[in-house]
Swiss-Prot record:
Keywords: 4Fe-4S, Cytoplasm, Iron, Iron-sulfur, Metal-binding, Pyridine nucleotide biosynthesis, Transferase
InterPro entries assigned: NadA, NadA_sf, Quinolinate_synth_type2
Protein task: Catalyzes the condensation of iminoaspartate with dihydroxyacetone phosphate to form quinolinate.
Recorded catalytic activity of this chain's protein: iminosuccinate + dihydroxyacetone phosphate = quinolinate + phosphate + 2 H2O + H(+)
SUPFAM superfamilies reported for this sequence: NadA-like
Protein name, entry field: Quinolinate synthase
Protein encoded by which gene: nadA
CC cofactor: [4Fe-4S] cluster
């Protein structure tokens, strides 16, 4: 939940001076392909003021991979996926954390940093996947499948994590599922709430998967025809897909893996042309670090992530508003599930999904 009363926002009226232009020049070099010069005259003073407020208030901003480039490159102290950001928040000396992401991410940061003030710039920044399941749903699932370990994707609320045996990310889901099956001495595991992630994991393991019909609205919209059209238009482009996409997308891709794995792939392989089958801003942000690579659509935009702006980040810092809290009992149990995952030996590299590996039978039971 989030506490506090919002103060009516008053747009920051900064002036684009030569000093601000010089100070923000390195950021401009990274965002200039995605931000117009006119937009930059508004954004640059905001970036300078937000960074000043961070120093004044001992605050840090966690910028998710799906943030717009002005946020990601301009004010993000830590950038990456939701779990990586929460872990960085826990290590940071900052007393105030502003979550430039959606609400479940702010909850995860609170779970790992209960002593810190966690702010979210917009209370309406939700998530279709996280809202697809509740803690009460998980309790009913456990009654239906007694003794079967519950593995929960980190893209869930603290209430759901609290009912979970261990959490996972898209990068380590196969590893966590196989660990849970071995630890519980069973051949089946409940993997919730993303149905497509569960089905894609099932293709990588012999463990039987019990899944929930939750979906990310961004990745669900992609179709195999999208990829076919892109290959026809750009025959040399390499296609990288996120495992929250339907299996037909992964089958049509050249590579599938987490956002971290995609980033590493582009950095290592340096493809001339690449298509990232994920949220739009991911390509925009990776492009700044890989200028020689041409990034081609399609992409789908997350309306929830895009609720976060420089202006409401500024408002959150100025007024220290929209603090995210988690009930103490829920927090302790949720932290146990996340910590179990963190304590597992990390893979040497972010996991990729083997698109060649053929399973004679993929056993997925949909709840």
């Amino acid at each position: 939940m989030a506490d506090g009363f919002a103060t009516a926002p008053q747009d920051f009226k900064g002036v684009f001076t030569p000093e601000i232009e010089a100070q923000t020049a390195p950021v401009w070099e990274k965002v200039k392909h995605h931000v117009t010069p006119m937009e930059w005259r508004v954004q640059a003073p905001l970036i300078v003021e937000i960074n000043r407020l961070k120093r004044e208030k001992n605050a840090a901003i966690l910028a998710h991979n799906y943030m717009t480039p002005d946020i990601f490159h301009g004010v993000g102290d830590f950038v990456g996926d939701s779990l990586a950001l929460a872990k960085e928040a826990a290590k940071s000396d900052a007393q105030i954390i502003v979550q430039a992401g959606v609400h479940f991410m702010a909850e995860t940061s609170k779970v790992l940093s209960p002593e810190k003030k966690i702010l979210i710039p917009d209370l309406k920044a939700g998530c279709s996947l996280a809202s697809s399941i509740t803690g009460a749903d998980v309790r009913l699932i456990k009654q239906r499948y007694p003794g079967v370990p519950v593995v929960t994707y980190v893209n869930t609320t603290a209430d759901v994590k609290a009912e979970t045996d261990i959490c996972c990310t898209s990068a380590n889901a196969v590893q966590v599922v196989e660990w849970a099956a071995k630890e519980w001495g069973t051949d089946k595991v409940i993997l919730i709430p993303d149905e497509f992630l569960a089905r894609n994991v099932a293709r990588q393991t012999d463990v039987k998967i019990i899944a929930w019909a939750g979906h990310c609205e961004v990745h669900k919209r992609f179709t195999a025809q999208d990829i076919a059209d892109m290959r026809a238009a750009w025959p040399g482009a390499e296609v990288l897909a996120h495992p929250e996409c339907p299996a037909e997308i992964l089958e049509a891709a050249d590579f599938a893996g987490s956002t971290a794995a995609m980033n590493d792939y582009v950095a290592a392989k340096k493809p001339a042309q690449v298509v990232l089958i994920t949220e739009c801003s991911m390509a925009s942000n990776v492009q700044a670090e890989s200028p020689a690579t041409q990034f081609i659509g399609p992409c789908n935009m997350c309306p929830h992530m895009k609720r976060i702006t420089l202006q409401n980040i500024y408002d959150a810092l100025v007024h220290e508003q929209y603090e995210v809290t988690v009930d103490a009992e829920v927090l302790d149990r949720a932290r146990l599930a996340v910590q179990r995952m963190i304590d597992l030996p990390p893979p040497a590299v972010p996991a990729r999904y083997d698109l060649v590996k053929a399973r004679h039978h993929v056993d997925v039971e949909l709840i």
